[in-house]
Curated annotation (Swiss-Prot):
Enzyme class: transferase
Family classification: Belongs to the methyltransferase superfamily. RsmH family.
Keywords per UniProt: Cytoplasm, Methyltransferase, rRNA processing, S-adenosyl-L-methionine, Transferase
Keyword Acetylation (UniProt): no
InterPro entries, A to Z: RsmH (IPR002903), SAM-dep_MeTrfase_MraW_recog (IPR023397), SAM-dependent_MTases_sf (IPR029063)
Residues reported to bind S-adenosyl-L-methionine: G35, G36, H37, D55, F79, D101, Q108
Name of the protein in question: Ribosomal RNA small subunit methyltransferase H
HAMAP family the record matches: 16SrRNA_methyltr_H (MF_01007)
Primary subcellular site in the record, as a coarse category: cytoplasm
Localisation per UniProt entry: Cytoplasm
GO biological process: rRNA base methylation
Catalytic activities: cytidine(1402) in 16S rRNA + S-adenosyl-L-methionine = N(4)-methylcytidine(1402) in 16S rRNA + S-adenosyl-L-homocysteine + H(+)
Function: Specifically methylates the N4 position of cytidine in position 1402 (C1402) of 16S rRNA.
Length: 313
């Protein structure tokens, strides 16, 4: 199934253009997926350029290993550890660009066996790396009702979080859920008001997936590490697919695009101001997919690309 899958990369040209590729530069694709961004980056690099790709999905790693290019290397692991990968290669402060395409990928969603989709029945798994960590089924079977409700409210912005959490716990007491269809049916039955444009399990599946994969913590750690690994003038090019992701990226870029916040009238010398440091990033704006891309790939509709540049400070 994996070999026959045709994956359309969202905001492909825009995200790579945002990196402002130098032929001899060193770049990181933190979310290799099926390699759309990586292949385009490689096509713009010269012989001296290098691309380090990262993914925690074993299926993505299998695809990456088919790329026979001395300029390219792949790491099986979370992109939150990019600081460690860069340090191991003695490349701190030498990275010219980092690209992140956040969230679950289309191949993951469309493969029922991965357990990400309420539209296809499969094992209730949802792990981006099925070789480690708790599956969605395991977590839902052991979590307290209050914890499930908190996850649904916080990561799914689900208004009926308490009702749904109660229904999940009650169902698991009777017979533990192991299939995506079972969870989708429990959520639908527990939802008193249906949205005619959205499946009632949409928010629950998003929330459980984010929790199981620690997705928001992964993003925050990767962003924090990026400041240390980027060279002056190095770019961040980040695609988000929902408001929780985009909020983190937007806040990070905004906060690091400011200079030191000093109260008005506070007496400080030039030397003291220098020690506080200046802004570390320059936000270069955001892009959203055009009508043509959305028509061709409806999943692109909610995507937002934000670009920033490391300053010389």
């Amino acid at each position: 199934m994996m070999e026959n899958y045709k994956h359309t990369t969202v905001l492909l040209d825009e995200a790579v253009n945002g990196l402002n590729i130098r032929p001899d530069g060193i770049y990181i694709d933190g979310t290799f997926g099926r390699g759309g961004h990586s292949r385009l980056i490689l096509s713009q690099l010269g012989e001296e350029g290098r691309l380090l790709a990262i993914d925690r999905d074993p299926q993505a790693i299998a695809v990456a290993k088919t790329i026979d290019d001395p300029r390219f290397s792949i790491i099986h692991g979370p992109f939150s550890a990019l600081g460690e990968y860069v340090a191991e290669r003695d490349l701190i402060g030498k990275i010219d660009g980092i690209l992140l395409d956040l969230g679950v990928s289309s191949p993951q969603l469309d493969d029922a066996e991965r357990g990400f989709s309420f539209m296809r029945d499969g094992p209730l798994d949802m792990r981006m790396d099925p070789t480690c960590g708790q599956s969605a089924a395991e977590w839902l079977q052991t979590a307290e009702e209050a914890d499930i409700a908190w996850v649904l409210k916080t990561y799914g912005e689900e208004r009926f979080a308490k009702r749904i959490a109660r229904a999940i716990v009650e169902r698991n007491r009777e017979q533990p859920m192991t299939r995506t269809k079972e969870l989708a049916e429990v959520v639908a039955a527990a939802t008193p008001v249906k949205d005619k444009f959205k499946h009632p399990a949409t928010r629950t599946f998003q929330a459980v997936r984010i929790w199981v994969n620690s997705e928001l913590e992964e993003i925050e750690q990767a962003l924090k590490s990026s400041l240390n690994v980027l060279a002056p003038g190095g770019r961040l090019s980040i695609i988000s697919f929902h408001s929780l992701e985009d909020r983190i990226v937007k806040r990070f870029m905004r906060e690091n695009s400011r200079g030191p916040q000093v109260p008005a009238g506070l007496p400080m010398t030039e030397e003291q101001l220098k020690k506080l440091g200046g802004r570390q990033l320059r936000a270069l704006g955001k892009l959203m997919p055009g009508e043509e891309e959305v028509a061709e790939n409806p999943r692109a509709r909610s995507s937002v690309l934000r670009i920033a540049e490391r300053t010389n400070v």
